[in-house]
């Protein structure tokens, strides 16, 4: 049971980073597991189950985009779902962590696909570059290069926002 929940969280967080919509990510997560159940006989074990599930989720999201042809964004009210805050910290630390999380999520939404998703998978889901490459049907080197490009782009977005706020 624990592994299933871990896989569900990985898929949901990946989809949130991909589509920016909490409700859509939940719907697509459910659809991902339904499709995985239907096609379990095709899982060949060449990659981790989490990678296979994220591949299914990615394809479902792109299918959704083809049908809907619209963009969405994450609402600030859903930030708590990322569980980025350590509940044992003091109130000031908790506030600072929440603010940093909001800032990072805002930056992730502003960088182009696939940079935000690659960054999320590496930094938060702790996937290897090989696994990230498999999700996007690309090489390990592609994932590595895009991760470092993502870090640069995210850093620039955050610096630009901080410079705007300090004016």
Q: Model segments located where?
A:
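DNA-recognition helix of helix-turn-helix
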Residues: 115, 130, 134-161
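Sigma70-family region 2
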Residues: 33-48, 68
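Internal acidic/polar
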Residues: 71-98, 128
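Arg/Lys-rich amphipathic alpha helix in sigma70-family domain 2
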Residues: 58-76, 97, 149
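Hydrophobic-face residues of short alpha-helical interaction/recognition segments
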Residues: 11, 15, 40, 53, ...
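Structural recognition of an alpha-helix C-terminal capping motif at a helix-to-coil junction
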Residues: 27-34, 47-59
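Short, charged helix-capping/linker segments at alpha-helix termini
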Residues: 12-31, 44, 135, 140, ...
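A short pre-motif secondary-structure segment
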Residues: 118-122
């Amino acid at each position: 049971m624990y592994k299933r929940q871990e896989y569900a969280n990985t898929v949901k967080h990946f989809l949130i980073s991909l589509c920016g919509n909490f409700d859509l990510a939940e719907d697509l997560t459910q659809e991902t597991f339904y499709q995985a159940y239907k096609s379990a006989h095709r899982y060949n074990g060449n990659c981790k189950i989490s990678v296979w599930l994220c591949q299914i989720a990615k394809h479902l999201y792109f299918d959704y985009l083809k049908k809907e042809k619209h963009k969405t964004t994450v609402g600030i009210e859903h930030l708590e779902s990322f569980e980025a805050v350590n509940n044992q910290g003091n109130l000031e630390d908790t506030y600072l962590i929440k603010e940093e999380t909001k800032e990072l999520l805002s930056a992730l939404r502003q960088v182009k696909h696939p940079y935000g998703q690659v960054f999320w998978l590496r930094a938060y889901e702790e996937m290897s570059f090989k696994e990230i490459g498999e999700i996007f049907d690309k090489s390990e080197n592609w994932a590595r290069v895009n991760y470092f490009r993502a870090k640069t782009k995210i850093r620039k977005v955050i610096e630009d926002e901080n410079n705007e706020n300090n004016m």
